[in-house]
Regions:
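Carbohydrate-active catalytic/glycan-binding domains of CAZyme proteins
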Residues: 10-16, 22, 26-27, 39, ...
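Short carbohydrate-recognition loop motifs
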Residues: 1-10
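Short edge beta-strand/loop segments characteristic of extracellular beta-sandwich folds
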Residues: 30-32
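Residues on the solvent-exposed faces and adjacent turns
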Residues: 35
Length: 454
């Protein structure tokens, strides 16, 4: 059994009008189609020039697998005649540093969602572009930049296939309530709620009888925010490996530049921590990022130390690299808004509340506290790229111990082990031991119960 903890959205308190004001500050569009989609050509249902456009179209399976249709996984949802009716909404943006990025799209196959008898809602708030049906979020992308159209009274075009349409700027009037959905199925092949949802870069953690499975929530096959991913982590927990709860996001993205990189969860002195990276360089040029400043701090002092986001912003730059979130219960996390290293995929582990280790490509670092001084204690290990015998990548090292042996596995092929109760690592991959099938993010953890997976 899987329990999904979701949010239901209510738009009834929003004031809707036939025409919008300026769309730059955000908007909600409520609309309904007048008839099923049977036309092969693109049919416009609404548009505001240089701002937003909604269309419907009947696609062949070949067309459904091309372009953005591939990102939306349309080919999985044909109708009884082998065609895919789709609804697509697009916004038009001015994106800083990237003038070539002008349009952002989301869509859904109408074989899954009824846009004729039920209202659909499109929401844009500067940070999110969302589609809702039956009060549930069904698709989402993450804009950066601003809507191109700056008019206070923009022109609106309504298509002939539109049963009803209305506009609102009452973003703050949208309310949410908790909602649980039960799935009578095992965890294998699990996908999160919503359209075109995927789980990737899985991280695991075991503490106090609870197994935490933390996964990248991905839509559109890494296609969100112009291919930058705009990823965040969600969390599943279980105590018996039969019944699972998907708690939703560990934390939500708050800024348009944020895209989370893989990390690890650890427990330290009565608090849970999640170490993660920010892949800010996917949207912001390197010269505007603080990673180089952190590196220069290390070269000057021999260690890195946490720097607050306020200090980074005051320097005219953006955070990237390694960051931390903290929690009292291991479920609800709050970002600490401090950057402590330039690494974008930090793997941090705690040892008896006394010391911390961060394992990254070409280096092991240690500190006495999460926001303390991080010092490089084992330069060059674990090796990656041309320095490694099996040419493993630098992504997402995983450290674990078993029966007196310490292990590190890392991107694609990396595999090292100490002797029993020893400290020196042996390159087991170079000896021909291939323990996993080329996983880019291999993760392992000890558990104190025997799993009975379903």
């Amino acid at each position: 059994m899987i329990t999904q903890k979701l949010k239901k959205y209510n738009f009834s308190a929003c004031s809707f009008f036939d025409r919008p004001n300026s769309l730059k500050g955000g908007f909600i569009i409520r609309f309904k189609l007048s008839s099923p989609v049977t036309e092969r050509e693109v049919t416009e249902i609404f548009s505001v020039p240089d701002a937003v456009r909604g269309t419907v179209r009947l696609l062949t399976l070949k067309e459904a697998g091309e372009g953005w249709g591939w990102n939306e996984n349309y080919t999985s949802y044909p109708d009884e005649n082998g065609f895919v009716p789709v609804l697509e909404c697009e916004i038009y943006l001015n994106v800083p540093y990237h003038p070539e990025r002008t349009a952002m799209k989301i869509g859904v196959p109408l074989t899954l969602y009824d846009a004729n008898d039920k209202d659909m809602y499109l929401l844009y708030d500067g940070m999110h572009l969302c589609l809702f049906s039956d009060g549930l979020l069904i698709n989402e992308n993450f804009p950066i930049g601003e809507i191109k159209n700056s008019s206070d009274a923009p022109e609106v075009k309504i298509g002939g296939k539109t049963e009803s349409i209305a506009f609102s700027h009452d973003l703050s009037a949208v309310t949410t309530s908790d909602y649980e959905r039960k799935l009578d199925k095992g965890i294998r092949y699990y996908s999160p709620a919503g359209h075109c949802t995927w789980a990737g870069d899985v991280v695991n953690f075991w503490y106090d009888g609870v197994y935490h499975l933390i996964y990248f929530f991905d839509r559109h096959h890494h296609g969100n925010r112009f291919g930058g991913g705009a990823h965040f982590f969600q969390q599943l927990t279980t105590t018996d490996f039969v019944n699972w709860t998907d708690h939703g996001p560990i934390f939500v993205l708050e800024k348009p530049w944020q895209s989370v990189g893989t990390g690890t969860m650890f427990h330290w002195r009565d608090k849970y921590y999640f170490a993660y990276g920010f892949h800010t360089s996917r949207n912001i040029p390197d010269e505007h990022l603080y990673g180089r400043d952190i590196y220069e701090q290390y070269r000057e002092n021999g260690y890195t130390k946490a720097v607050s986001y306020d200090e980074i912003y005051n320097a005219g730059k953006y955070p990237n690299g390694a960051n931390l979130a903290v929690s009292d219960d291991g479920i609800h996390f709050k970002m600490m808004d401090k950057m402590f290293h330039w690494e974008e995929n930090p793997s941090v582990y705690s040892f008896d509340n006394e010391s911390l280790m961060m394992c990254i490509g070409n280096g092991i670092w240690n500190a006495d506290s999460p926001l303390g001084e991080w010092k490089l204690t084992n330069p060059g290990f674990p090796p990656c790229g041309e320095r490694s015998s099996m040419r493993n990548s630098s992504e997402c090292p995983s450290f674990f111990s078993k029966n007196g042996y310490n292990y590190i596995i890392m991107g694609l092929t990396g595999f090292w082990r100490t002797e029993k109760d020893g400290e020196t690592y042996i390159d087991c991959a170079a000896e021909g031991h291939d323990i996993y099938d080329g996983l880019l993010v291999p993760m392992a953890v000890n558990v104190s119960v025997k799993p009975t997976c379903q």
